Design a protein with these regions (language model features):
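C-terminal lobe/tail of nucleotide-utilizing enzymes
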Residues: 2-6, 164-231
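N-terminal phosphate/diphosphate-binding loop that engages ATP/GTP or pyrophosphate donors
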Residues: 4-5, 9, 25-96, 100, ...
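Conserved glycine(s) of the Walker
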Residues: 21-22
Length: 231
């Protein structure tokens, strides 16, 4: 097992300010970038994916971007049909989610890979089960947090709440990535970057333009994360 992130983490938890704001987009870009830097064993993990009627789309994108050998049902061990929070989806299908199963799967992936990119379903405090939420899971798996901020009106509050709550629980926040997931040039969206630089207290890792997907942008983000090893 290698700890490539700050010398003490094998994985990164990619979470966000909301659902549908580009977490998978950022996670797949990072996976591709790790490969481009010569790290050939990149693991990906989305413990729970909801809104699945066939193959879990996000898990498949993650698997393909990392060129990993795990089957999709390992990348996403829990899938549910309804596009709702994991805890609710699991209750509706009477299939409880176990943190033990998630941890065992994470460790299995970790034995075969140098780094693991883990993606949440929704935000950091979305309930997974009676055992807790993604913040609890991050603590259990010893994962630092990368926050994807969807650039739109209201994102300042969502981002600051996520960052400050994570830090109050003792989680390390590596920084945040701004993602223009919509073509929104409203004053509210434009001021998000300025406000977060002033008040977030964590590093700004990069800004992704609408529909942008490039190794260059991924490297810009990843270099800042890996540069933290000297901190």
């Amino acid at each position: 097992m290698k700890n490539l992130i700050k010398g003490r983490y094998q994985g990164i938890l990619v979470t966000g300010t909301d659902t549908g704001i580009g977490k998978t987009h950022v996670a797949t870009m990072l996976a591709k970038t790790f490969l481009a830097t010569g790290i050939t064993h990149v693991g990906v993990f989305k413990p729970i994916e909801t809104g699945v009627t066939g193959v879990p789309a996000d898990a498949l994108k993650l698997k393909e971007s990392a060129e990993c050998c795990e089957e999709v049902n390992i990348v996403a061990p829990y899938t549910f049909k309804e596009p709702v929070a994991p805890w609710i989806a699991a209750k509706k299908e009477n299939r409880p989610i176990s943190f033990d199963v998630i941890e065992k799967t994470y460790n299995y992936i970790g034995e075969k890979h140098d780094v693991i990119i883990v993606e949440t379903a929704g935000g950091l405090f979305v309930p997974i089960s009676e055992q807790g939420n993604y913040a609890d899971l991050a603590k259990r798996l010893n994962l630092p947090i990368l926050v994807v901020v969807g650039l739109r009106l209201g994102a300042i509050n969502h981002a600051l709440l996520t960052i400050q709550a994570a830090r109050s629980l003792g989680l390390e926040v590596l920084g945040y990535v701004l993602n223009e997931f919509e073509t929104d040039d409203s004053p509210g969206a434009i001021t998000v970057e300025e406000a977060l630089r002033e008040f977030s207290g964590v590093p700004f890792l990069g800004k992704i333009a609408h529909n942008e997907f490039s190794i260059e942008k991924g490297r810009e983000i990843l270099d800042k994360v890996l540069d933290l090893t000297a901190a």
